[in-house]
């Protein structure tokens, strides 16, 4: 882990969670004091739970609440979509954009991710921009080229350490139980760091780079010890307070 960058453990609940799941979030709030010296915590529930979670967290500063996606426009005739401004109004402090499941399920391009990132900033929030390669791209030896292209096109020129976090999520590792080796993660995060510094200079040196892809309590400490890994984007393991907090303790 890069020592001067405070780590972030971000939980992406994806399309999981009903009102009864508030109990898990309350348990996270209750246990957060044990890890606040190690990392910042962020939970991104489905939009139906966002405002309720934000109300629970208000005044504690123990766990921040975020969103999983937004529309690029501030308002308009976009049935079923939510703007960054709406999510900010509901209590979000950050929004995930460009997750591989959005790219795959909804055909979101790097250009769309770029537009959504700017929308997140327009609402005064932090953008967590996801990049990563598929198994086919990995097998073809295209990982670095794919990441370079995604970063160049997805990240707007105004990116700073304060308004942007990058999340590397190898698509082949998401929800599969598979994870790259610590050496692989180190090489890829070093590559991402180099690209960020080349483009954004000192800001790029201070940006958080999260690792995402089957992060769980049993492998968190090893992954978080890797250079240029400044936290994690956690999927399934973030649904349980005990697992989520255990991952944060690995920082």
UniProtKB/Swiss-Prot annotation:
Pathway: Carbohydrate biosynthesis; gluconeogenesis; Carbohydrate degradation; glycolysis; D-glyceraldehyde 3-phosphate from glycerone phosphate: step 1/1. One of its GO terms (cellular component) is cytosol. Its main location: cytoplasm. It comes from the Bacteria. The keyword Cytoplasm applies. InterPro entries: Aldolase_TIM, TIM_sf, TrioseP_Isoase_bac/euk, Triosephosphate_isomerase, Triosephosphate_isomerase_AS. It catalyses: D-glyceraldehyde 3-phosphate = dihydroxyacetone phosphate. Its EC number is 5.3.1.1. Substrate binds at residues 12-14, 175, 214, 235-236. It is an enzyme of class 5 (isomerase). GO terms for molecular function: triose-phosphate isomerase activity. Keywords: Cytoplasm, Gluconeogenesis, Glycolysis, Isomerase. CDD domains: TIM. It is found in: Cytoplasm. The active site is at 99 (electrophile), 169 (proton acceptor). PROSITE patterns: TIM_1 (PS00171), TIM_2 (PS51440). GO terms for biological process: gluconeogenesis; glyceraldehyde-3-phosphate biosynthetic process; glycerol catabolic process; glycolytic process. Involved in the gluconeogenesis. Catalyzes stereospecifically the conversion of dihydroxyacetone phosphate (DHAP) to D-glyceraldehyde-3-phosphate (G3P). NCBIfam families: tim (TIGR00419). Belongs to the triosephosphate isomerase family. Homodimer. This is Triosephosphate isomerase. It comes from Bradyrhizobium sp. (strain BTAi1 / ATCC BAA-1182).
